Amino acid sequence: MKLPIFIADAFTARAFRGDPAAVCLLENELDEDMHQKIAREMNLSETAFIRKLHPTDNFAQSSCFGLRWFTPASEVPLCGHATLASAAVLFHKIKNMTSMLTFVTLSGELRARRAEDGIILDFPLYPAHPQDFHEVEDLIKTAIGNTLVQDICYSPDTRKLLIRLSDVYDRSFLENLKVNTENLLQVENTGKVKGLILTLKGEPGGQTQAFDFYSRYFAPWVAVAEDPVTGSAHAVLSSYWSQHLGKKEMHAFQCSRRGGELGISLRPDGRVDITGSAAVVLEGTLTV
């Protein structure tokens, strides 16, 4: 069997930045275990599988598809950058002419629509609630040592722990912070936490571009030590920072080595629009 496959760098307009995701187009149903084997072979933080929902569907003309995401270790319920990569492949490489795509996923229907400055993802907005420090003290100390922490919240919907670093730190500190992910699986093995968000309040622009907040994201529980740019984490971050900054429109930067920018707009219906660009850097055929 031969499958069309692509790699797209998401949340960037330039190759070799942002977050790379593999995108596989499925004309027919794939054996269940083959999804995981392909994701392991691609060895990226996520591999997306776009499937037709009806035999008469066409990747170039239809507007609604099934979408699943796999890390090298397991299937995940939501992945922003691989959704953006999937939309970019359909819009820019397959030349799908619809103005909006709908993806049927484990997290419900997600929509991606064209915009002048990229692609807009319509995502759920997940609240984060205050978390008692002592319950997660070992996890925090293991990950970031004695780094000063200003706030801790937990998102039960996504099982992500959000740690806001002290406002005394700047972007450079977050970028250079050494985070110990190797021992997190031993410290947190209850299943409560599946992802760790570190975040920091933004700074005035000055000579550099202004961002409302910065972040990094770690998910060793699903075999992703650090994810370069994470749309699903921003479905939590958007809720948190909107409350603390009193803003509905925000500009975010994820401070991984590759780095990526996200535009954020909270909607009246309780969801969030996340805007980003994507660069398709590889296209080929996978033989299985």
Swiss-Prot record:
UniProt EC number: 5.1.-.-
Keywords attached to this entry: Isomerase
Top-rank taxon, per record: Eukaryota
One Gene Ontology MF term: isomerase activity
Positions annotated as active site in the UniProt record: E46
GO cellular component: cytoplasm
InterPro entries, alphabetized: Phenazine_PhzF-like
GO BP field: biosynthetic process
Quaternary structure, from the entry: Interacts with UNRIP/MAWD.
Family according to the record: Belongs to the PhzF family.
Protein name per UniProt: Phenazine biosynthesis-like domain-containing protein
Organism: Pongo abelii (Sumatran orangutan)
Lineage: Eukaryota, Metazoa, Chordata, Craniata, Vertebrata
